[in-house]
Amino acid sequence: MRVHAIEAFDDNYIWAIETNDKDKVIIVDPGEAQPVQQWLEQNSKSIETILVTHHHYDHTGGIAELIEQSPCPVIGPENPEIKTLTKTVTEGDELTVGGIQWQVLTTPGHTLDHISFYTPGFLFCGDTLFSGGCGRMFEGTPEQFTQSLLKLRKLPGETRVFCAHEYTQANVNFALKVEPENAVLQSYAEKVRMLREQEQITLPSTLQLELAINPFLRFDQKSVIAAANKHAESVKNSPEDVFYTIRQWKDNA
């Protein structure tokens, strides 16, 4: 399965997924219409279906214009703020879109309505999980966000992670504050630095890599727990408390 990144705004990625029909693509989280329209024209493609992970405008703002130009199904979480949906989905739903079998995972935390789309080898997780980080906790609770991340941790390690923002360099710089002696993280940070110096994309990541370097997936590791306790100057042992401590640390960094 081939996936293409369409850059939008300052740091968003809209994903274009090739389907069994060589002339059509699935578009994930089109926050802006113009970059998608330009990419479609340059590549002689049209949209089969739009997938939406959550209601934030930088993930949905381009939908109305795109479907006005070329009507297509729009699939996403149940939320009245997403007025363009033609089908709502939730945990456990299975879809066939573009000849591809998809599983829907509810992943609240960043927002309450957040979902992710998974097909073997590929995860489209919006703002739940970033390379080296995770989304800000705007609506959910630490318990909800932790459960969402635990759910993603169970996916196969070779799963490629397609998140929605180019935040990797800032994320790994923060991760190094949490685990400065993590050799895998040190190596990855250097790779990311070189890619960004060349204005190259750092995504997709893999779940195996994220499990080795991402403090928001490593909240039960001794080194991350110790860093959280040191930062908070108190004992934080539960996954939820450790996660919340490092999330607040990152928010205020």
Swiss-Prot record:
EC assignment: 3.1.2.6
Family designation: Belongs to the metallo-beta-lactamase superfamily. Glyoxalase II family.
Record's protein name: Hydroxyacylglutathione hydrolase
Annotated pathway: Secondary metabolite metabolism; methylglyoxal degradation; (R)-lactate from methylglyoxal: step 2/2
Superkingdom field: Bacteria
Alphabetical GO biological process terms: methylglyoxal catabolic process to D-lactate via S-lactoyl-glutathione
Record keyword Metal-binding present: yes
Lineage: Bacteria, Pseudomonadati, Pseudomonadota, Gammaproteobacteria, Alteromonadales
